[in-house]
Amino acid sequence: MRIAVICFCLLGITCAIPVKQADSGSSEEKQLYNKYPDAVATWLNPDPSQKQNLLAPQNAVSSEETNDFKQETLPSKSNESHDHMDDMDDEDDDDHVDSQDSIDSNDSDDVDDTDDSHQSDESHHSDESDELVTDFPTDLPATEVFTPVVPTVDTYDGRGDSVVYGLRSKSKKFRRPDIQYPDATDEDITSHMESEELNGAYKAIPVAQDLNAPSDWDSRGKDSYETSQLDDQSAETHSHKQSRLYKRKANDESNEHSDVIDSQELSKVSREFHSHEFHSHEDMLVVDPKSKEEDKHLKFRISHELDSASSEVN
């Protein structure tokens, strides 16, 4: 950018410097000037009004281009682009001032110099147009699409319970007002859409009430209710089984306890019976020696009496 600015400044300076006619002209030019002095003078010194008329359309074109570019540019342009535009405007002003000064001061210049100045101005404008096109900002903000805020209603204007189809139908409803009312404002469209959606909701609610088709939520609720009933029944059967097993275990334990008690009582009775028999046997053993002694004593008495009787007989 700096190099381009320096080049434009140099071009403006060279155009502003008056060009003096060389005295050492060729012989042919001198001959032509001597033969046709008036024609050469008019050819070398054109009317300044003609120059202004020639430069006016070019200046108008350049000003129109700058105005169009300013209208197209947005406020989100970077500082570098602003600085560049300011520099280009300053250069344009300097070039126009220099061109006017050269027109006023170079009334006696050659037509070739004017042609060179015109060519330099054209090249300057062409360079400006190229630079303006290349410096166009690339990161333009996208146009914001207005989406009206509408209260959502859980009524689906489509097949069954498909949410996607209902959303598509709603999007179609959103697009219809743009086609039917091209001159309407955003507020009118939103109010119209809200009224249409509310009317559609009131129409759809009684239809949905009249329909008795089972939905996914109903089927899910029934399945969950059936599974809960099955779980409750299984829990009840399990509890009944556990109670029965517990009763059986309690009965078995009570029977075992009663059997143990009966066996203990029988063992006690048998022990008592055996002890009684043992005591009776011991008593019998104690009585027998006494009877033997008495028998012996009786036998002794009987034998003694017999002896005494026999002795008396003798």
From Swiss-Prot:
Please provide the record's keywords in A-Z order: Biomineralization, Cell adhesion, Cytokine, Glycoprotein, Phosphoprotein, Proteoglycan, Secreted, Sialic acid, Signal
Matching entries from InterPro entries are given as: Osteopontin, Osteopontin_CS
Cellular component per GO?
cell projection; endoplasmic reticulum lumen; extracellular exosome; extracellular region; extracellular space; Golgi apparatus; perinuclear region of cytoplasm
Q: Which residues are glycosylated?
A: 134, 138, 143, 147, 152, 234, 308
The answer to whether the entry has keyword Glycoprotein is yes
Q: Segment Disordered: which positions?
A: 41-290
Show the coiled coil region(s): none
Could you say which tissues express the protein in this record? Answer: Detected in cerebrospinal fluid and urine (at protein level). Bone. Found in plasma.
Question: How is it modified post-translationally?
Answer: Forms covalent cross-links mediated by transglutaminase TGM2, between a glutamine and the epsilon-amino group of a lysine residue, forming homopolymers and heteropolymers, increasing its collagen binding properties.
From the Swiss-Prot or TrEMBL record, state where the protein is found: Secreted
User: To which protein family does this belong?
Assistant: Belongs to the osteopontin family.
Q: What is this protein called?
A: Osteopontin
Its gene is: SPP1
